[in-house]
Amino acid sequence: MQITTNIASIRTHIPQGVTLVCVSKFHPMEAIMEAYECGERDFGESRVQELLPKYEALPKDIRWHFIGHLQTNKVKQIVPFVHMIHSVDSVRLLETINREAEKIQRRVKVLLEVHVAKEETKSGFSPEEFLSLASSPNSLIASSPNSLNEASYPWVEICGVMGMATNTDDESEWRRCFRAIASLASHLSPLASSPNSLIASSPIAYSSPSERPQISMGMSDDYLVAIEEGSTMVRIGSTIFGFRTSKL
């Protein structure tokens, strides 16, 4: 019942319009089902080899979010069912997702991962790389279409950005990171017409029912600050499921 209690507590702090992604990586299916019985449907996993058996065994109305580093050779295993890939950190990965999605004729939702934290170990486009793609599409190599728009990647639905704050207890540093992520998200523009249109209104365009980019930021320690700074999607694990003592 602890998971039920934890979710109820967290829900009191999450406003309408912010999606709670329950980060279930390294946690057993029984724990996921307890959260599911509370009404949760969005779950986050970071390893393909762990996600696949969970997808096969658990209810099919679960929306699976892939939040970890994704190797290009594993993309084809999750594109048939994944709800959203949060961790697109390179044009090469975006190209692979588009190619595999086209094979099965299924558009895949993604977020572009941006790196604003102080740790060099974190992945993602640097702010400079992100803004370069947004503002200078003509400088990109024509033989390998790298401008992040619907015309280049018709089978990828760019929904927004994802990022992480520096691993610190300093709230001011959290805010710096979250404001930087939200600022980068503001450089995304909605599609010119329908979500299926191949004409984008900017080099980096997103397709979102709410006509605003999704901003996936905030975890167990800092999600309240992230929400204050504009997060539309928080990824919470240990505060729901407890700390993981060992990997599955």
Predicted regions and their residues:
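Divalent-metal-activated hydrolytic enzyme cores
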Residues: T232-M233
